[in-house]
């Protein structure tokens, strides 16, 4: 299963960084692979929030429905999308760092069914996709990439 992790030090206080990251409406602001986001349940981030995230795919656009599975403000947010071809798990953790915070964004992608046999190939492309998203995230958080959250 391809996995991508980035740690970003930002001047934003933890509550502000968490609120920005947990609102998936903001994905389109920082991830160039996201075309559009529509919230279909809830109002803003929260434990009941559900979002349709339209992402660029090989043959056009694919819409993934993300359901919030963990919401522990201002520290941890997890959203999961499961469809016939794939399962996506996005985890965001935030910890205090001086007057700012460190945001850790982790994305895991699992191909389902017979597609799981091409997971290694997807892993190669997923690294490049993750790097582009990380660049946008660093810019959106006015931050810098760090090697670890500690």
Segments predicted by a language model, with ranges:
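Hydrophobic ligand-binding cavity/cleft-lining segments
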Residues: 1-41, 150
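Well-ordered beta-strand positions in beta-sheet-rich domains
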Residues: 5-9, 63-65, 89-91, 106
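Amphipathic alpha-helical segments that line or abut small-molecule/effector binding pockets
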Residues: 15-18, 131, 135
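Residues located in well-ordered beta-strands
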Residues: 33, 65-67, 93
């Amino acid at each position: 299963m391809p996995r991508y992790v980035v740690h970003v030090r930002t001047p934003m206080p933890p509550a502000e960084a968490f609120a920005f990251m947990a609102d998936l409406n903001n994905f389109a602001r920082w991830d160039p692979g996201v075309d559009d986001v529509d919230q279909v349940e809830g109002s803003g981030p929260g434990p009941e929030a559900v979002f349709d995230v339209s992402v660029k795919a090989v043959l056009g656009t694919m819409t993934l429905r993300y359901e919030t599975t963990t919401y522990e403000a201002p520290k941890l947010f997890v959203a999961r999308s499961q469809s016939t071809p794939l399962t996506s798990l996005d985890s965001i953790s935030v910890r205090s760092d001086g007057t700012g915070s460190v945001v850790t964004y982790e994305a895991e992608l699992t191909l389902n069914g017979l597609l799981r046999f091409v997971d290694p190939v997807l892993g190669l492309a997923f690294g490049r996709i993750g790097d582009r998203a990380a660049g946008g995230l660093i810019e959106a958080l006015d931050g810098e990439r760090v090697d670890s959250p500690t």
